[in-house]
Amino acid sequence: MFDWLWSDPLIVGNEAPDFAARDDRGRFVSLREHRGKWSVVLIFYPKDETRLCTKQVCDFRDSWQSAEARETRVYGVNPDSAESHRKFSSKHDLPFPLLVDEGQRIAKLYNCNGPIVKRTVYLIGKDGRVKFARRGTPSPSVVLATAD
């Protein structure tokens, strides 16, 4: 019944699954477009405007310049609507896009799906491989230390 709680994140070193989704700004984003150019942080979080989710996303907001300096793009990911994401982003001055994960399609690819999205952070290298994968709320500095 609760097997979904115990699934592991993707294995570090493996190729990250490609995905495509719209962000809160209406732009179409895919992992493939970053390959060879940028590392990518994916912050999977359950819901906009909840206490822990807001703290986690704002921690990455506060480290955004460090991510940019490491040629790393940051994306929040959850199944909330584009409108919810726009309001959340505006309220908290988020400098990075939030992806609309309809039907938890991206979450399924990254073993984060379930009745609620499992809080997980990934860093995908410029080579398309998983460099960092951890459930919970790892510090942005720990995550970004693994960037190419």
Segments (PLM) and residue ranges:
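Chalcogenol-based redox active-site neighborhoods
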Residues: 1-148
